[in-house]
UniProtKB/Swiss-Prot annotation:
A motif (PTAP/PSAP motif) lies at residues 42-45. One of its GO terms (biological process) is viral budding via host ESCRT complex. Belongs to the vesiculoviruses matrix protein family. This is Matrix protein. Late-budding domains (L domains) are short sequence motifs essential for viral particle budding. They recruit proteins of the host ESCRT machinery (Endosomal Sorting Complex Required for Transport) or ESCRT-associated proteins. M contains two overlapping L domains: a PPXY motif which interacts with the WW domain 3 of NEDD4 and a PTAP/PSAP motif, which interacts with the UEV domain of TSG101. The gene is M. Pfam families: Vesiculo_matrix (PF06326). Residues 11-36 are annotated as: Disordered. It is found in: Virion; Host endomembrane system; Host nucleus membrane; Host nucleus. It comes from the Viruses.
Length: 229
């Protein structure tokens, strides 16, 4: 019986003979497996996926969208919110375990910046130590600047999210019904991010950050969604 060392030696000699016999052929041999970071296409095609999209995604730059939106927001919390940003921090739980359209998510977040700002407390809910309830309903058309790359077509249709949350200082339930879609209107529209509707520009940008958006102000006073986390 041959030893393991002898078997390995024979295997090496056989490999050398194969290399010599294949020398000058057009077939490709891997001397070593591809590196971990090397990007390869999947072995099977993905239906409906255009690989060319990945080539121009980073070069799209700043884009403009005209959106039609509507949002109905209902919130019940154990304790009253102390400020707008406190409300935003808690209402941000609306997207916990998000299962909606991924392409719409950044724009849902932008609408929520304004929807939370419009929330009003129900006076009846503040009596007799009951849990406070807040509601808001907003709708309109707006201009959105973004550098998020390719955005899929967005139909104006309703999605609904109901979530409960529990934090260090408060807990409750949030119910959101939201519509967002692209509109082809020729009207001049205001931006979705409007510091005049907030206490300050800093407050508005902080709210966007809490809701998972990175918003930057350009030299011509446009507010651009640069990232959605």
């Amino acid at each position: 019986m041959k030893s393991i060392r002898q078997l390995l030696s024979l295997a090496k000699k056989e490999k050398k003979r194969e290399k010599k016999s294949n020398h000058g052929s057009h077939s490709m041999e891997w001397e070593s497996p591809p590196s971990y970071n090397e990007i390869k296409s999947p072995s099977a095609p993905i239906f409906g996926y255009d690989y060319e999209d990945m080539e121009y995604l980073p070069t799209l730059g700043v884009q403009t969208l005209k959106l039609q939106y509507k949002c109905v927001l209902q919130v019940r919390s154990e304790s009253p919110f102390t400020s707008y940003l406190d409300a935003v921090d808690n209402v941000a739980n609306w997207e916990k375990q998000y299962n909606g359209f991924s392409g719409k998510k950044p724009f849902y977040r932008a609408v929520m910046v304004r929807a939370v700002q419009a929330m009003k407390a129900n006076p009846m809910s503040l009596q007799d130590g009951r849990s406070p309830e807040y509601t808001s309903e907003i709708e309109g058309r707006c201009l959105v600047f973004h550098s998020l790359g390719h955005i899929p077509p967005m139909m104006y249709m309703c999605e609904q999210f109901t979530r409960d949350w529990s934090g260090r200082r408060n807990q409750g339930i949030v119910n959101v019904k939201i519509w967002v879609g692209v509109t082809d209107t020729l009207d001049n529209l205001d931006q979705i991010f409007d510091p005049k509707k907030h206490f300050s520009e800093e407050e508005m940008l902080s709210a966007a950050t809490i809701l998972g958006l990175e918003v930057k102000k350009s030299s011509d006073n446009n507010y651009i969604i640069s990232k959605s986390y």
